[in-house]
């Protein structure tokens, strides 16, 4: 049954809608999955994934392909790279995450502070000159595609921003939720509404997603902090769902997509924890990220296919380097196994090969792994 979302409206004063009954099955699956997951329900889990993985993914959604190793190096020593724009977008998110971990109230003043952190040294002169005390003071055009034939979208008119942002804060801070999954749904409705308003000229998407993370932290819905990872793996669907919700005022499909994508990421996290338990020492961030990417692969897993996936999400590397840096360490630790070589070669001396997760070493609860191919 479709019902009105209370507290938020369009710029034409019409309602947004959602079909909660349609969402109940996936919500129930998530609650069942999380029932026995003690580690994922801790603040330390959130802090761990926010350290570098979420920084990478939140920027990756916007089309930036920073390698996880480089992100960690910049976080440790922000003078280690000369590219000022790259350094700023990484350090800004890292500092923004530190800010929301303080659990301060999500308010107009605190959001202003967060936005200053996230946008530092990233805005154009025009953007800076046309910013009001809190929000943009001019129209903004939103391009979801490089195709010039597709007309840009627009944020709401500047004179309406204040009213809609006040509704946004009231909606987020009006606490009626009973479960962590309810808080996740609310955070993603707010995520959409923020993008719909588009209160700034730039950095709206990163701010929307970071503020949704803020709501999750504030309400101790810690497992869901990884939702950006799901978006990062399905960016085209993400932007299509935003446009569909804008055109129909119905958020059901958008929220259903985000519930399913975060369920996949939680399953991967469960598998990752089981893998970690088989090792004598903790895996590196690079190894963890590689395993998570492997779990995202559909169909046959080969060196060439993994290279293609890696180069879609990172600064490009040669297939030989990817084999040596990403896959060989996992082969040595018996986390993945080489099944067979293929007819193709990746250079004059190396053959492409099929690999798989070493399931013999994993004691997985099959009831918890329903969406991920092992």
Predicted feature locations:
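FIC/Doc superfamily catalytic core
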Residues: 1-201, 207-374
């Amino acid at each position: 049954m479709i019902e009105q979302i209370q507290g938020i409206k369009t710029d034409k004063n019409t309602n947004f809608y959602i079909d909660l009954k349609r969402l109940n099955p996936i919500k129930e699956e998530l609650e069942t999955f999380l029932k026995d997951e003690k580690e994922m329900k801790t603040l330390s889990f959130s802090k761990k994934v926010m350290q570098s993985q979420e920084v990478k993914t939140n920027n990756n959604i916007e089309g930036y392909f920073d390698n996880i190793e480089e992100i960690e190096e910049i976080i440790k020593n922000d003078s280690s790279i000369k590219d000022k724009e790259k350094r700023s977008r990484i350090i800004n998110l890292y500092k923004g995450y530190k800010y929301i971990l303080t659990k301060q109230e999500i308010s107009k003043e605190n959001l202003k502070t967060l936005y200053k952190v996230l946008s530092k040294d990233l805005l154009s002169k025009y953007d800076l000159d046309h910013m009001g005390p809190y929000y943009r003071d001019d129209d903004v055009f939103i391009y979801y595609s490089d195709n010039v034939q597709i007309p840009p979208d627009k944020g709401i008119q500047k004179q309406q921003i204040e009213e809609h942002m006040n509704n946004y804060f009231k909606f987020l801070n009006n606490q009626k939720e009973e479960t962590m999954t309810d808080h996740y749904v609310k955070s993603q409705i707010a995520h959409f509404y923020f993008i719909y308003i588009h209160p700034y000229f730039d950095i709206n998407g990163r701010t929307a997603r970071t503020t949704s993370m803020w709501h999750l932290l504030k309400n101790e819905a810690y497992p869901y902090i990884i939702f950006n990872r799901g978006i990062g793996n399905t960016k085209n669907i993400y932007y299509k769902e935003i446009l569909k919700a804008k055109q129909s005022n119905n958020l059901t499909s958008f929220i259903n997509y985000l519930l399913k994508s975060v369920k996949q990421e939680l399953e991967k996290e469960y598998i990752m924890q089981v893998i970690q338990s088989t090792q004598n020492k903790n895996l590196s961030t690079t190894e963890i990220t590689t395993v998570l990417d492997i779990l995202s692969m559909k169909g046959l897993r080969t060196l060439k296919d993994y290279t293609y996936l890696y180069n879609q999400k990172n600064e490009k590397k040669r297939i030989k380097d990817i084999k040596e840096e990403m896959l060989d360490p996992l082969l040595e630790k018996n986390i993945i196994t080489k099944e067979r070589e293929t007819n193709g070669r990746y250079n004059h001396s190396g053959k492409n090969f099929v690999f798989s997760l070493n399931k013999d070493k994993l004691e997985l609860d099959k009831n918890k792994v329903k969406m991920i191919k092992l």
